[in-house]
């Protein structure tokens, strides 16, 4: 059987939709369950799951720490995910991809600017139609900030993210995931439209985060009935005098 490789983005472990599909309300329990599936896949099928180091590994570690996950989660990350730095100097990307990315970013920046301008006009219009008693200037300023500006800024931030950030590679870890997957000829696991879009451009296989656990479960359902032990244990027992070393792929 061909050994498969996967490169995980942080969202492969933290995606809310994935937890809901698996039936876990807690982030930490969801992460444990996914990592346990990865462990089973490693032991039974030799499937390797990589994480770019240090960028994505650091994100995962900090995410688990911020959300109060116990040391077991970090131990599972360290044990079952292969930490590897992407070779940024040897993996080449065609100039056409780079050209398209620059053009795409320029378009998104212009769209973001349009959203900002609309927000400014909306705020100015709202202010013009409010009463402004001169003897209550301080109270009026606070009211404008609270009732008008605050709400508009909130809407602006959401619209700006949607217009500018959705569908682009907006962080170094995102790029590391794609470079490492390209280097290893591996599939990317993520819940990020930007990574999905540019994985397609780079010819890298993409598996949505909410599909990945079910894929591993499907593999495990088709284990031979007499295979009750991990693959490497069966192999070692069949060889007398084996050194007991495990070759990780």
Curated annotation (Swiss-Prot):
Residues 232-242 have a biased composition (Basic and acidic residues). It is an enzyme of class 3 (hydrolase). RNA-free RNase P that catalyzes the removal of the 5'-leader sequence from pre-tRNA to produce the mature 5'-terminus. GO terms for molecular function: ribonuclease P activity. This is RNA-free ribonuclease P. One of its GO terms (biological process) is tRNA 5'-leader removal. PANTHER family: RNA-FREE RIBONUCLEASE P, UPF0278 PROTEIN TK1425. InterPro entries: RNA_free_RNase_P. Belongs to the HARP family. It comes from Methanosarcina barkeri (strain Fusaro / DSM 804). It catalyses: Endonucleolytic cleavage of RNA, removing 5'-extranucleotides from tRNA precursor. Keywords: Endonuclease, Hydrolase, Nuclease, tRNA processing. Residues 226-249 are annotated as: Disordered. Its EC number is 3.1.26.5. It comes from the Archaea. The keyword Transmembrane helix does not apply.
């Amino acid at each position: 059987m061909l050994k498969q490789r996967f490169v995980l983005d942080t969202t492969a472990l933290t995606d809310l939709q994935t937890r809901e599909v698996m039936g876990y309300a807690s982030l930490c329990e969801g992460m444990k369950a996914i990592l346990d599936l990865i462990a089973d896949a490693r032991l039974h099928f030799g499937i390797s799951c990589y994480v770019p180091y240090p960028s994505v590994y650091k994100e995962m570690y900090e995410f688990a720490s911020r959300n109060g996950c116990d040391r077991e989660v970090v131990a599972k990350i360290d044990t079952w995910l292969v930490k590897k730095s992407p070779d940024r100097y040897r993996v080449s990307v065609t100039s056409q991809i780079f050209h398209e990315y620059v053009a795409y970013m320029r378009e998104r920046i212009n769209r973001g600017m349009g959203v900002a301008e609309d927000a400014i006009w909306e705020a100015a219009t709202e202010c013009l139609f409010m009463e402004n008693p001169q003897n209550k200037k301080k109270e009026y300023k606070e009211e404008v900030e609270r009732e008008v500006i605050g709400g508009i800024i909130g809407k602006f931030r959401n619209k700006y993210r949607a217009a500018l950030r959705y569908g682009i590679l907006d962080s170094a870890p995102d790029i590391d995931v794609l470079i490492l997957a390209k280097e290893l000829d591996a599939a990317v696991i993520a819940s990020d439209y930007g990574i999905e879009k540019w994985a397609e451009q780079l010819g890298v296989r993409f598996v949505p985060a909410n599909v990945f656990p079910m894929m591993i479960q499907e593999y495990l359902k088709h284990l031979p009935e007499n295979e009750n032990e991990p693959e490497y244990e069966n192999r070692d027992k069949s060889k007398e005098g084996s050194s007991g070393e495990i070759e990780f792929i």
